[in-house]
Every structure is written in C-alpha cells, then in structure tokens.
C-alpha cells in the first residue's frame, strides 16, 4: 500500500526566493562604510568654498561674493544694528543685542559693526539673570518698609538689604540708614499711644482745659495788641508833629531876632558942675 501523495517530504528547491536575495543585498550595503567628499584644509584666515579656500572678511564685514579662480572674496560692511566680531566667511551679519527698558535694562556698551551691545541694569535695579558679561534681566531694588532701616544699599548685582529697627527706635518711611530714638515723656505730658518701630510717640497734655486757656489767652492778647496799636501810633504822630512845629517856630524866632537891626536910643547927658562958690566948707 502506498502512502498518499500529500504525506511525502516537501520537494527541495535549489533556487532561493527573491525576498531572501533582497535582504542579503540590503544588509550588505547597510554595513558598508560611507565615504563623504573631504573638505579642503584651509588656513586660519581662509574658509572653504566647495573644494577651494577663500580669504575671510575682516571683523565688521560680511561676504558679499565668494572668491573665484581669478578673484578674491568680495566683502561689504555690516548694516546698522548688526555686527561681526571676528574674521569670518559669513554671508549675513549677526543681530545686535537689544536692551529692553521694560526688563530694567540699559546699554552699558552700544553695539557697533565689530562689537555686540552689552546690557546692564538701569539705576535703581540689580541683575537677576547674568549671561557672561551681559545681564539678561534686572529687578528694581526692594523698598524698606516703615519700621526698617537700610542696612546696605543695592548694587548692580545685589538687592537692598533691610533690617528691622531695634526696640526704642523708629523709622517713619524706611529710607533711613539709622533708626531714630523715640522721645521720652516728661511729668507734664502723658503717652497717648505706644510708640512702634514705624511711628513716633504721640504726646498730649494732661488737661484739655489748660490747652484751651493758653489758646484763648494768646488770641485775646493778639486782638488787644492789634486794637491798641493804631491808637498809639496816632498819638505818636500827633506828638511828633507838634514837637516839630514848636521846634520850627523857635528856630524862626531866633532867626528873626538875629536879622532885626539893633534898637539904639541916644540919651543926652547933661554935665553938671557942682558950684561951691560962695559956700564955705562948713555948710
């Protein structure tokens, strides 16, 4: 009895399938080393262009046209707002750094064709993000609160350092470098409220009537002085006018007396000779 034809061994194929050949070829090419065309070895002041070396442009210039067999590199200056700091073979210049005032920045060194701008902090700000010699972001100085003193002022790299006032001292606005001592109460006054590190002692008189009496007395004195002052001034003026008038009249009298001619009256003098004739000395 012969076995059925389906039970026999599979027939042998001497030719491999097409898929197997493709796989072998793929693995062969995948493992093969890849060779790229070698770039020319150029000097430090040259840059490669294809298989040739061209001279680099100076700082502040870019390549406008690469060199040829008979021509050198054509360079042109960088436009405003751009720069190149080194010898280069670049076709475009680099954009200058912008210092944004909204970030508290200002240009500590302006941009030129050969140097990039360097940003620093605006006055009243300190740097919070440092990038080499360039500051990328700044922040405003902290403000000391009332009751604090400025222990150390802010710098371009450090914020303001604040410190609380010790007991018995105060700082009204936080801008003082040293806190002030609070006033001590005397026996005439009493403390209306406890002094804090941010406010001074508040003092009031013991009796409100004393304040009223002083104020009323002062106001009354001022009113009396103002009322009497004009009357006294009038009296002074009258007395002064009368005195001047009297002085003027006296001076006029003296002048008239000096200018008047002298009043001379001639009196005849009769000479009498005593007669002793006929009289004896006994009479």
Swiss-Prot record:
It comes from the Eukaryota. It is found in: Cell membrane. TNFR-Cys repeats lie at residues 42-75, 78-119, 121-162. Residues 39-202 are extracellular. Disulfide bonds join 42-53, 54-67, 57-75, 78-93, 96-111, 99-119, 121-138, 127-135. This is Tumor necrosis factor receptor superfamily member 14. It comes from Homo sapiens (Human). InterPro entries: TNFR/NGFR_Cys_rich_reg, TNFR_14, TNFRSF14/UL144_N. Glycans are attached at residues 110, 173. The chain crosses the membrane at residues 203-223. It holds the Pfam family TNFR_c6. GO terms for molecular function: cytokine binding; receptor ligand activity; tumor necrosis factor receptor activity; ubiquitin protein ligase binding; virus receptor activity. The cysteine rich domain I (CRD1/TNFR-Cys 1) is required for interaction with BY55 and BTLA. The modification Phosphoserine is found at residue 240. GO terms for biological process: adaptive immune response; cell surface receptor signaling pathway; defense response to Gram-negative bacterium; defense response to Gram-positive bacterium; immune response; innate immune response; negative regulation of adaptive immune memory response; negative regulation of alpha-beta T cell proliferation. Residues 224-283 are cytoplasmic. Its main location: membrane.
